């Protein structure tokens, strides 16, 4: 996802000299093509994320479109007050970019486990939250995000994620959800890089004779209400999957929306329970430990369908 982000950003920077990227002293292996090509549109704010965010807000007030870039919780939780007071409150044209949503940096411990970010950023008035599931979605979302007024949050994986869509996504318009696979028995809704596990779970369910529809939500605030309403009329069971706490995140957004609609379907949320991730390990290891890998998604879905 990181490489897809850089490619898309460079295409936009060529068209708009006001586009500015501010990094918190990292990401140089990925961002090097950007700063070498557009040195006047690149700032290294150092390991000072609060200052980075305040700087971005100030630059945005001069008419620039500014992106802040860091890993894990550092561009979000570490500077949430600056995002709230300096950026979102003023509708500043700042796009907060997190590389490493969920357990991407799992081996570095809970300080680097980004499992509350979507809920916190979703709660800020006026902030748009983007959660692409594969590199194709990233490249489709970046130009849309840059055209979206005000403060936005872009939650990325790290790198090496497979392309799950058959090809580039043309003419994406937020918050449109994207169907990867049609099904008849259950709907699996996914937000973010956990999409790889959701698609794999659908394959496992197919082996059990269960037809699962897979829908990716590259934008969760605002959320695609029309798609949710349509799914609620077709499926008795809807399963949400996120590498994030089930409290206030994607699953919460789906529940809130369908409850307001008076939908009669059952909603089941897969993600972190209301606990901290106290285990250290690789991303896949932690997905397995917290029952959000493909096998767990399959097993839990089968159990719900049997109820």
Model-derived regions, located:
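Thiamine diphosphate
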Residues: 1-155, 157-307
């Amino acid at each position: 996802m990181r490489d897809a982000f850089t490619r898309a950003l460079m295409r936009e920077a060529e068209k708009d000299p006001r586009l500015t990227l501010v990094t918190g002293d990292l990401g140089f292996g990925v961002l090097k093509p950007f700063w070498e090509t557009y040195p006047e549109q690149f700032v290294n704010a150092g390991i000072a994320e609060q200052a980075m965010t305040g700087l971005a807000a100030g630059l945005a007030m001069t008419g620039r479109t500014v992106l802040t870039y860091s890993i894990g919780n550092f561009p979000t939780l570490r500077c949430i007050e600056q995002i709230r007071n300096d950026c979102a409150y003023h509708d500043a044209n700042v796009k907060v970019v997190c590389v490493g949503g969920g357990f991407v940096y799992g081996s570095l411990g809970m300080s680097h486990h980004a499992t509350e970010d979507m809920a916190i950023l979703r709660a800020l008035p006026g902030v748009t939250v983007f959660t692409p599931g594969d590199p194709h979605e990233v490249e489709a979302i970046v130009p849309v995000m840059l055209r979206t007024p005000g403060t936005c949050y872009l939650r990325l994986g790290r790198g090496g994620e497979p392309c799950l869509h058959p090809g580039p996504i043309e003419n994406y318009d937020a918050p449109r959800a994207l169907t990867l696979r049609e099904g008849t028995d259950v709907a699996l809704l996914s937000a973010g890089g956990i999409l790889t596990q959701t698609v794999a779970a659908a394959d496992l369910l197919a082996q059990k004779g269960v037809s699962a529809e897979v829908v990716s939500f590259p934008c969760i605030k605002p959320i695609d209400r029309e798609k949710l309403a349509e799914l609620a009329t077709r499926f008795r069971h809807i399963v949400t999957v996120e590498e994030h706490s089930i409290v206030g995140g994607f699953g919460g957004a789906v529940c809130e929306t369908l409850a307001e609609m008076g939908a009669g379907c059952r909603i089941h949320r897969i993600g972190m329970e209301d606990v901290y991730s106290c285990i250290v390990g690789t991303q896949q290891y932690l997905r397995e430990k917290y029952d959000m890998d493909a096998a767990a998604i399959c097993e839990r879905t089968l159990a719900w369908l049997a109820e």
